Amino acid sequence: MGKASFWSDEVPVEGPRREIINETMVFGHIPYPVTCSSVGNPHLVILMDEISKDLVCRIGKYSETAKQFPEKINTQIIKVLDRTHLQTEVYERGAGYTLASGSGCCAAAAAAYRLGLTDPKMIVQMPEGTMEVEIREDGEIFLTGDVGYVGSISLGSYFTEQLKLV
């Protein structure tokens, strides 16, 4: 999955260049300790004692379009169970509540590890999937888990012709 970057200009987050680690940000008039990272797309991770779909949706509707995130942002709330297990709920930019996310899983794991709360190898539980994440010494993140068939689509000729133009 690559490496996580916590640098504000790589996420991106407005303001001076800095690593966004355990920084306070306000969403919906409530301050949260946040860690932001890019794992190819932007993520906001909030450590909490309790997590739920309702809570991530409440925060996500504000954080997704907050002015400090010029490219919008995916939001994860996480609960660390122990040094090798964490739970996360995900709110994806442009999609809303999401049952599972590979990049969200990696961002959550990278944030928890960077905060010193987990070992480099951990299990991440999401509502529709459990993944194993390993953060190697060089920072590379490896994601392992099951995949499942979701569905299929048929694309019309107009759409496939447009793809050829790209």
State where each predicted segment sits:
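Helical hairpin unit composed of two closely spaced alpha helices linked by a short loop
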Residues: 103-105
